[in-house]
Structure formats: C-alpha cells, structure tokens
C-alpha cells in the first residue's frame, strides 16, 4: 500500500517539475533540441499565435498551433510528425534508402527553402495573448509524452529495435545483441545488390509484420493507439498512407495466399518469437493442418528464444505451449494445435492466432477458428499456399471481392493474362508484371515442364500461386460504369431527330415455344445517333400457344412496335431494314417476314395522306445448296464478331437507349432498359485454354438472352463495318 502511494506521489512531483520546466524554458533551447538530433517532444511552446478561430486550429508538437488546413496536407503532416519519434526509430530504419539520418539534418528540405525560412522574423505577441495556444500546445504535448513514458510503448519500441537487428542480419543473428552468427535452417541467401548491405523482406512478409504490429499496438496501447500510428508510419516507411489504409492493418482478420516455398512459415518463426519476447502478457495461437507441421515451428521458436535470452526464461510443454517469462514475473505464451485437435484452442484467449496452411485444415476446425472473431482483442492471420486443382483446397479464394479486402494473393500472373500463360507452356510470369522472384526459389520454363511431366497442370495449380482458369470458366465482359451510364443517360430522339441517321434496323430472333420459362422472341429496333447507336424499341414476346398462327402473332408484335416508333418520329427515317433470324425454322422466318411486309404496307398506305412512308427492306439470304434469295438471316460465324463489336461500343459509351423507347410486351411496372440490362449483366466470355477461342453467352443461371441477342445483332447490322448489306424489298403479289 505504501509503495503504491509513494509511486503516485513521485509521479505527481515529476509532472509538476515538467510543468515548471515548460514555463521557464526559452525558444533558443527549443531549436537546440532538434539540432542535437532529439525529437519534437523536447521542444517547448514557441511564443506565437495564429489568428484563426479555435475550431479551425490544430496543434503539432514541435511546431505549434496552426490552421487545421495543414492537417490536410499529407506531406507537411508526415514531415512534422515524424520529428515526434525521431530519436526512437532504430538507425537501421532511418534514411536507409539514401544513407544517413535525414530527419535530424533536415536534408529532406530544399536548401533554398531552408535559407528562406531562416530569414523569416516573426512579431512577438504579448504572453497573455498566447495563453490559449500555450495551453492547447502543452495539452497535446503531454499526451505524446505520456505515450513515451508508457510501458506498452517501450515494449513496442524494443520490438521494432530488435526486429531491425534481425533484419540487418537476415534473421541469422544468434543473439539480438550480435550482428553475426551461424545461418539458421532455410535462411534466406543474400544476393549482392548495389547500395544494399542488409536483409530485406518480401512485400507479403512486410504486410504480415504490419498487420501483427498494428493490431498488437492497438490492443496494448489502448487510448494511445491513435498517437502511435505516427511512429509506425515512420518505422514502416509509409508516411503518406491515409488513415483508411492504416485502419486496414488493424482489422481483426486477414488472409495471405502465397506460392510454395516463398518463406511463409520461415518468416512466422522470428515474428512469433520476437513478439513473445517483447510484449508482456500476450497470448499467441498457432495452428496448422497436421501435427507434423506444428512440431518444427515449435522447435524453431523454442530455439530462437533460448538462443537470444538463455534457457532460464523459457518454459515449454512438448508440442503444446511455450512460455517466456519477464523480470517482473509476467509471461507471454504461445499455444500450438493441429486442425485434428480442435479442442486444443477452444477456451483460449489469444491476441494473435496464426492459421498456417489454412486452405488444407479440416472444416470443423475452421468453425472453431471463426469463433475467435467474436473476441475484440484477437486478430486471426490466415497464411496458406494454394492448390487450385480442388475446390476444397482453395476455398479462401471465395473471399475475393469482399468489402473488407481480407484477401491478399501473391501471384506472378494477372487474371487477364492467365489464359495465355496456361496456353504457352514456357511462360511462368505475366508480361505486365515485374518479376520480383525470391532468391531461394527457382521458377522457369524448365521447372514448369518438369512439373507437368509428373502431373499435368501441377505447375499452375500447385506452384505458381494464381488461380488457373479451368476449361469453360467464364468472366463478365461489360464494365459497371458503362452499365450505369446506359441506365441513366437516355437522350430524347423526338427532339433531336436531326442527329439520327435515316436508316432504321429491326432484328427479330423468333422462338417457337409456348414455354415462357424457356425462351421468347427478342425484337430490337435500333438506329444511328451521330457516331453511336440508339435503341428505339425492345420487345420480349412469348406465344400463348404453339399453333399455326405463331408466325403471324410474332409479325404482329413486330409491326405494332415498329409502327409506334415511326409515329413518334414522323419523317425521320427513309428506310426500315428488317432481319428475321431463320436458324430455328426457315419456313417460319419467311412467313414472319411476309406478314410484316403485308401489315406494314397496309399501315403505311393508310397514312399515305401525310406523305410517302419509309422504304421497307428485308435481309435476304441464299441457303446452302440453293440459288434463290429468301427473306431471312442465318446466324453462323457472325455471332462472335457481333458480340465483340457490341462489347467494345458498349464499354466506350457508344450504345444508348432513347428516352421515348417503345415496348408493348414488357410489363408496365418494369423499365424496358432495366429489363435489358439484367440480361446484359449475364453476358460472359468463355476462353478455351487450348485454342484461345472466345465464345459469348448470356444463358447464365437459367436466364433468357433473347432480347440481348436481338439488340447485339441489330447493332451489328447497323454498323458501317458489319455484315455486307443484303437488304431488298419483297415483291408484292396481286
């Protein structure tokens, strides 16, 4: 009791002395602190004030009270705040890219700027005028000083210092105080690099380190977690990272998928060992798919701790736990368990839980691990290699596209070039990636050929790390931004008829079935609008019954839609060009064209008093083995070029819908453009890995694609470089 009271009195006395020193110290002593290589926490309040309302002021220790617009300048904010922790950053991490301590020497500033600032003279203000700024300054300064004095922050600083020492020796140091030592098992081989004298981390290893450090700092420092972000930004050399990016490293789960033999487990060993030896009272969990995988990690961590600190501070139960004791009696512990012993981690209270080879652990073990997401001070780090040959051993790929950005995939091939790399047997990396290959692996065409000799596709599925596309795999081809523009931007064609071409194109994709769940007749009326295409009418027609009048019913739907378009745009078109697809039934296609011809001429004749109507033309085709042209269109090899042309125009904003779009079949409560957009969203591209042939389809999840095909083919017929014109009138019979 008396010891606790004495400690409290000493703390209060220290704070009073600190306050008296702050009031007496002068401005000259302030600059001396930084000149001698100190940090901004030694700089007292500089006697100046800013003429800004209090709500627009911000305080930067070592600088003073400024306008808060300075907070929105990342460069200024980063430079000013790095001075807060300058003396605490290990020498190995300060200015190591260029050599020397740039922060203390102010070498990051242009000489002209330094000279200009040195010539500035500020007007002194009365002491009573600067009282609010002085109080605000010391309030913020005391917060950072309390952070510096906290035991948790000291532990973090020691962790950073010791990790820098390990990094300097490429994790070969037998003691944290030494710089040399025998190489450890599977130690990374150093490669001579100009201007580089110590070990480096792979990018994914640095990200794992940042995830672990940021989360432990947030848990241990509590209220000071925000202030320590400045220190960690300086340590990890990310001064311009936004607050959103930093919060990403403090989330409570993350996943890393890394190719084989890239140093995943090798890096986790020193990270876990040093965390145990630096942070007091933490608990770490480590689990893998089998017990044989946890035993070497257990032995390596135990050997590291004993080599660094001696055997007296390390206790372990073989294969289960390792405890590291501190001089004050506190302990840090790591628990090992395999996925075959899920009860080994139940009931534990971890701060970090490493799941090694997570793609290969048992499903019931995954459920046990997920339970730790409910613990506020626990972070789960999944680290695994990939085997994309089986869905059961690549389930973590399902996290792609998650809003929290949980998944981090290390691969040498992007999604766009994956089919080409699969096709070319000598390629091992993507042409658009810079191959930063770890020095302790080999990966070339010979390795790929050898692996595939043992087992086909083993290189792509087991070694490369990316998810190889299976034959028949597909991907969407229309961009989200183009789809949103198609839905929102609809120009008026009734008021801008002068911008439209005089030709109108109609494509009919008939379906002769009464099953409304199967498919229907797609009808699209399209024209040119400047250099773009515009849709005037959309119809998705289903037959009530499959009878002999089906061609007449389909033709009547075409005529009703086309007549409304012509009525809305009087005199705008000189010709109407109709193409009726005849792949399913050529006889029915001819009947549809004949009915459309008859009905349209009757309607145009009744409106003859208003002037001559547009010329009615039909696409004519010569069937195989015949010598007579018939009014139908055979869709053969034109489909793929038509889809590719439409995708290019749609994604570049060259396809629009008229504001006065006509539809007599789509229900009133459904927007015809949205109805078409739903079908367009199902459009996928399938690439054959062996032949690199592209195929397109919209029949995904049982959805219909009739209207989409009609629109795409109508646009292709209207394209200047599309199908050669073969439109002729049907001879009228008396």
Swiss-Prot record:
Key word DNA-binding present: yes
Instruction: Provide the GO biological process annotations.
Output: chromosome organization
Q: Report the active site residues.
A: 357, 509, 581, 706
Could you list this entry's UniProt keywords, alphabetically sorted: DNA-binding, Host nucleus, Hydrolase, Viral genome packaging, Viral release from host cell
Q: Identify the residue span(s) of motif Nuclear localization signal.
A: 183-189
**Any idea of its EC number?**
3.1.-.-
Say which enzyme class the record assigns: hydrolase
Give the InterPro entries listed for this entry.
DNA_pack_C, DNA_pack_C_sf, DNA_pack_N, HSV_TRM3, P-loop_NTPase
Q: Where is this motif: Walker B motif?
A: 352-357
Name any GO cellular component annotation: host cell nucleus
Q: Where is this motif: Walker A motif?
A: 258-265
Pfam families assigned to the protein according to its UniProt record, in alphabetical order = DNA_pack_C, DNA_pack_N
State the compartments where it is located.
Host nucleus
GO MF entries: DNA binding; hydrolase activity
The record's subunit annotation is: Interacts with the terminase subunits TRM1 and TRM2. Interacts with portal protein.
**What does the similarity note say?**
Belongs to the herpesviridae TRM3 protein family.
Q: Function, please?
A: Component of the molecular motor that translocates viral genomic DNA in empty capsid during DNA packaging. Forms a tripartite terminase complex together with TRM1 and TRM2 in the host cytoplasm. Once the complex reaches the host nucleus, it interacts with the capsid portal vertex. This portal forms a ring in which genomic DNA is translocated into the capsid. TRM3 carries an RNase H-like nuclease activity that plays an important role for the cleavage of concatemeric viral DNA into unit length genomes.
Query: What protein does this entry describe?
Result: Tripartite terminase subunit 3
Organism equals Human herpesvirus 2 (strain HG52)
């Amino acid at each position: 009791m008396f010891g606790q009271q004495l400690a409290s009195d000493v703390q209060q006395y220290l704070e009073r002395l600190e306050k008296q020193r702050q009031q007496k110290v002068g401005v000259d002593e302030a600059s001396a602190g930084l000149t001698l290589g100190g940090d901004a926490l030694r700089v007292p309040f500089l006697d100046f004030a800013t003429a800004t309302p209090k709500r627009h002021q911000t305080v930067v220790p070592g600088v003073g009270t400024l306008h808060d617009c300075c907070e929105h300048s990342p460069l200024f904010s980063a430079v000013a705040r790095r001075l807060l922790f300058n003396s605490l950053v290990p020498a190995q991490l300060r200015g190591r890219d260029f050599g020397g301590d740039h922060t203390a020497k102010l070498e990051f500033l242009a000489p002209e700027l330094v000279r200009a600032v040195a010539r500035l003279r500020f007007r002194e203000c009365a002491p009573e005028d600067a009282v609010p700024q002085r109080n605000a300054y010391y309030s913020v300064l005391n917060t950072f000083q309390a952070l510096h004095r906290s035991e948790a922050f000291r532990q973090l600083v020691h962790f950073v210092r010791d990790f820098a020492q390990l990094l300097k020796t490429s994790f070969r140091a037998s003691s944290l105080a030494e710089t040399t030592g025998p190489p450890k098992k599977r130690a990374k081989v150093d490669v001579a690099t100009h201007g580089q004298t110590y070990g480096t981390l792979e990018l994914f290893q640095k990200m794992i380190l940042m995830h672990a450090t940021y989360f432990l700092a947030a848990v241990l420092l509590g209220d000071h977690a925000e202030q320590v972000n400045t220190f960690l930004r300086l340590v990890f050399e990310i001064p311009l990272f936004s607050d959103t990016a930093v919060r990403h490293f403090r989330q409570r789960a993350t996943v890393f998928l890394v190719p084989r033999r890239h140093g995943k487990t090798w890096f986790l060993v020193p990270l876990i060992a040093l965390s145990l030896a630096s942070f007091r009272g933490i608990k770490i969990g480590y689990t893998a798919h089998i017990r044989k995988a946890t035993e070497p990690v257990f032995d390596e961590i135990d050997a590291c701790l004993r080599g660094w600190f001696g055997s007296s501070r390390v206790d372990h139960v073989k294969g289960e736990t390792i405890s590291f004791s501190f001089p004050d009696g506190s302990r840090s512990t790591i628990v090992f368990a395999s996925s075959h012993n899920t009860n080994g981690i139940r009931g534990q209270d971890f701060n970090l839980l490493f799941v090694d080879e997570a793609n290969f652990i048992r499903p019931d073990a995954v459920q046990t691990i997920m339970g730790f997401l409910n613990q506020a001070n626990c972070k789960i780090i999944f680290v695994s290699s990939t085997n994309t040959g089986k869905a059961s051993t690549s389930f973590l790929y399902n996290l792609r596209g998650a809003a929290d950005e949980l998944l981090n995939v290390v691969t040498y091939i992007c999604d766009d070039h994956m089919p080409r790399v699969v096709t070319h047997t000598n390629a091992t990396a993507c042409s658009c990636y810079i191959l930063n290959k770890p020095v302790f692996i080999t990966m070339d065409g010979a390795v790929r050929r050898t692996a595939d000799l043992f087992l086909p596709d083993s290189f792509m599925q087991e070694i490369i790390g990316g998810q190889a596309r299976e034959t028949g795999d597909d991907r969407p081809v229309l961009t989200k931004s183009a789809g949103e523009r198609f839905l929102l931007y609809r120009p008026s064609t009734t008021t801008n008829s002068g911008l439209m071409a005089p030709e109108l194109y109609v494509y009919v994709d008939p379906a002769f079935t009464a099953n409304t769940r199967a498919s229907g007749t797609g009808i699209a009326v399209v024209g040119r609008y400047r250099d773009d295409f515009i849709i005037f009418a959309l119809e998705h027609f289903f037959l009530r019954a499959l009878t002999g009048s089906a061609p007449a019913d389909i033709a009547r739907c075409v005529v009703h839609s086309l007549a409304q378009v012509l009525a809305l745009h009087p005199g705008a078109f000189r010709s109407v060009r109709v193409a009726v697809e005849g792949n399913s039934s050529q006889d029915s296609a001819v009947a549809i064209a004949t009915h459309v011809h008859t009905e349209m001429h009757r309607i145009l004749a009744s409106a003859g008093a208003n002037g001559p109507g547009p010329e009615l033309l039909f696409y004519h085709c010569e069937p195989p083995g015949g010598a007579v042209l018939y009014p139908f269109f055979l869709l053969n090899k034109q489909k793929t070029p038509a889809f590719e042309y439409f995708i290019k125009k749609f994604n570049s904003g060259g396809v629009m819908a008229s504001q006065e779009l006509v539809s007599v079949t789509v229900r009133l409560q459904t927007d015809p453009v949205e109805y078409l957009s739903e079908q367009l969203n199902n459009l996928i591209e399938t690439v054959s890995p062996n032949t690199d042939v592209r195929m397109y389809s919209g029949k995904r999840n049982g959805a219909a694609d009739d209207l989409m095909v009609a629109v795409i083919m109508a646009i292709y017929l209207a394209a200047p470089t599309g199908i050669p014109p073969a439109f002729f009138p049907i001879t009228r019979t008396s």
